[in-house]
């Protein structure tokens, strides 16, 4: 979504799994209307997601995808840009900022993986709200993370099974969305 305005800030937004660029369609007009600066918004599909082809080479990890997306920004004529990512998009965006600090002038992540500092008491200073979030994360790891282990260890098995069943694929993905979001406002 190009603004065609002088001084527009290029913003690359990268989705995660099981998402696609579709998750950005409603936010693009809001960003345009509420931003204090004009934005050129670029939302590429991760390789193998949405309408993009599957990777043809082994090793298509977040770091390599970041290199490809940087090449895309360069090919589009952007020397400096800002990135945003969630889920897998956050790891790609992090790599873009790390690998291309002269080009990536800003980063926003809505999934940040961080670990407590080492020390005698890593929980020192953790608030009650933060403890509740940690409890929720532990519940998620024990009850909602099985899909990740299956996809990580046996991707071909689940891939073949879901490829032959549109209902199975829809159930596999929609179950994640319903489990991850609460409330009627999250539609």
Where are these regions (language model features)?
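Conserved small-domain helix->loop->beta segment predominantly found in fold-type I
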Residues: 187
